Design a protein with these regions (language model features):
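FNR/FR-type flavoprotein reductase catalytic core
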Residues: 71, 75-217
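Hydrophobic beta-strand signal
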Residues: 35, 80-84, 227
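Structural signal for conserved beta-strand scaffold positions within catalytic alpha/beta enzyme cores
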Residues: 6, 51, 158-160, 210, ...
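Short Fe-S-cluster ligation motifs
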Residues: 236-240, 244-281
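Short, Lys/Arg- and Gly-enriched loop/turn segments at beta-strand edges
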Residues: 42-49, 88-97, 238
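Local cysteine-cluster metal-coordination motifs and their immediate loop/turn environment
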Residues: 116, 191, 213-243
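Short, surface-exposed secondary-structure boundary micro-motifs
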Residues: 39, 85-86, 231
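Ferredoxin-reductase
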Residues: 1-77
Length: 281
């Protein structure tokens, strides 16, 4: 069992959880993720590592309640059954930051994508690199960790669907006019957002890295649930990724696979809600 220090709501439908997991944070490099199990019989939830304290052995995650497993996790108070990680490959820029010191870098974060973007930007800032960020959300109240992000970025621009903060529109509306100013782009967020970012950056011949978030089960590549088509070849997000060249991803197939079990997931989510409410009483 792993001790939970807190599990708090940070926006509508999103939570931040802090867990004591010294072995997980010991060797982590931003861009990696972990699998979290709320209980012994729970499904494994792949969560990007949002922050970590290697001295105290604490790992932090921000997650959105989008199904039965994350609904169950949102009710956790004192401990979780398992935390496995770090998994996946580190971010290319963080791993080889010396090679990017003279490059102009822009990160594009959508919604909860701000969580995995933050440790990468902070890591690069701590190693002397200046990074710009474009952050988007449906509305101002859903923009995560603004204060923390603003301390480590060179420049940050915001976009909200309803215009309540920053540019009214999407992150691509902000990116398109300035894309030629950069040498590399990293996009993290909903699948459709990453696809539209790649559509824009391809026009500008701007190299783009995306962090794929497909269905995932075991985190070892054995189950094949997280398979993606990259440059026409099968890759597994859990071991080869989660980051890939965005211009080589088959997003149509990726989004189709994401929706494969949508009805079953909704039914299971409804059952989980009823069970948790019953246990609460």
């Amino acid at each position: 069992m792993y001790k939970v220090l807190y599990n708090k709501k940070v926006t509508s439908g999103s939570y931040e959880i802090a867990i004591e997991a010294p072995l997980v944070v010991k060797k982590v490099i931003p861009g990696q993720f972990a699998l979290v199990m709320a209980k012994e019989d729970s499904e494994r939830i792949p969560l990007s590592i949002y922050d970590y304290d290697q001295e105290k052995g604490i790992v932090y995650f921000i997650y959105q309640v989008v199904g039965a497993s994350t609904e169950e996790l949102s009710y956790v108070k004192d401990e979780v059954f398992g935390v496995v990680g770090p998994l996946g490959q580190p971010n290319e820029i963080c791993k080889n930051f010396e090679d990017f010191k003279n490059k102009k870098i822009v990160y594009v974060a959508g919604g909860v994508g701000m969580a995995p973007v933050y440790p990468q930007v902070k890591y690069l800032h701590d190693h002397g690199l200046k990074v710009d960020v474009i952050a988007g959300a449906r509305s101002a109240d859903l923009l995560l960790i603004r204060d923390k992000m603003e301390k480590v970025v060179n420049k940050i621009r915001y976009a909200t669907d309803d215009g309540s903060f920053g540019t009214k529109g999407f992150v691509t509306d902000v990116l398109d006019p300035i894309a030629d100013d950069y040498d590399i782009c990293v996009a993290i967020g909903p699948m459709i957002m990453m696809k539209t970012v790649c559509d824009v950056t391809k026009k500008h011949n701007l190299k783009t890295i995306v962090s794929m978030n497909p269905l995932m089960v075991d985190g070892s590549g054995m189950c094949g649930a997280c398979r993606c088509e990259v440059d026409g070849k099968p890759k597994f997000a859990c071991i080869h990724g989660p980051e890939f060249d965005g211009h080589k991803i088959d997003f149509s197939l990726a989004m189709q696979r994401m929706n494969t079990y949508k009805e079953e997931e909704k039914e299971k989510w409804d059952q989980m809600k009823k069970r948790l409410e019953k246990e609460k009483k």
